[in-house]
Amino acid sequence: MTATAFRVGLWLAVTASFLLTATNAKIPGVYSGGPWQNAHATFYGGSDASGTMGGACGYGNLYSQGYGVNTAALSTALFNNGFSCGACFEIKCTDDPRWCVPGNPSILVTATNFCPPNFAQPSDDGGWCNPPREHFDLAMPMFLKIGLYRAGIVPVSYRRVPCRKIGGIRFTVNGFRYFNLVLVTNVAGAGDINGVSVKGSKTDWVRMSRNWGQNWQSNAVLIGQSLSFRVTASDRRSSTSWNVAPATWQFGQTFSGKNFRV
């Protein structure tokens, strides 16, 4: 082997080793959010936000899940086919006294629902959530913190922000023997998740597929095993919760794991 060939081979080996290490390494730091952008906002759900319960993210009762009224339904352009569920936004009304609350306050909301398009209406007159518009349909109590009721729709500025949650990531396990459907809620940091894996005490890690919203499924038989979960957020950071469900777990139970740092 010539000296040149040896150096090339050594460089390729070092490069491959570096790429493998970078791929498997943990990403340092915390989620930092994004830049301010422009959109519009309306409201729904009534003065008590009761009409916002359930929704396309699968969170069910938003009060008991800890989201409360600080929620929003996202237009197609923002919803990302459900992968944006759990993302957190800071929103403020464009500083216009005709439509905005004095002082230009901002609100913090979590994406919990989908605002469907209405192609029977033009995008600037009723079809507020039609693509490609970026639009937030806010729980009514949150809208009234930034905009006047008589306005109906207001121009806003928004940005992604880190989600700050109390307690750990929650895993609600539903399904039956050969089908596990896990609802993932209360995610801090980026808030929205791109991947979930589950590990039984007698199995290797099994990558789950997204069923809908933030419900993730697996066909592995896990009954009688303690369960660990690994959640990967949209910023590619991962959080592993070891043995959060004991071997005696039952379908319908919720378990709290390790959350992301904020």
From Swiss-Prot:
Residues 178-257 form the Expansin-like CBD domain. InterPro entries: Expan_Lol_pI, Expansin, Expansin/allergen_DPBB_dom, Expansin_CBD, Expansin_CBD_sf, RlpA-like_DPBB, RlpA-like_sf. The keyword Disulfide bond applies. It is found in: Secreted, Cell wall; Membrane. It is a peripheral membrane protein. It holds the Pfam family DPBB_1. Its main location: secreted. GO terms for biological process: plant-type cell wall loosening; response to gibberellin; response to red light; syncytium formation. Disulfide bonds join 57-85, 88-163, 93-100. It comes from the Eukaryota. SMART domains: DPBB_1 (SM00837). Keywords: Cell wall, Cell wall biogenesis/degradation, Disulfide bond, Membrane, Secreted, Signal. Residues 54-168 form the Expansin-like EG45 domain. Residues 1-25 form the signal peptide. The keyword Oxidoreductase does not apply. GO terms for cellular component: extracellular region; membrane. Causes loosening and extension of plant cell walls by disrupting non-covalent bonding between cellulose microfibrils and matrix glucans. No enzymatic activity has been found. Belongs to the expansin family. Expansin A subfamily. This is Expansin-A3. The lineage of its organism: Eukaryota, Viridiplantae, Streptophyta, Embryophyta, Tracheophyta.
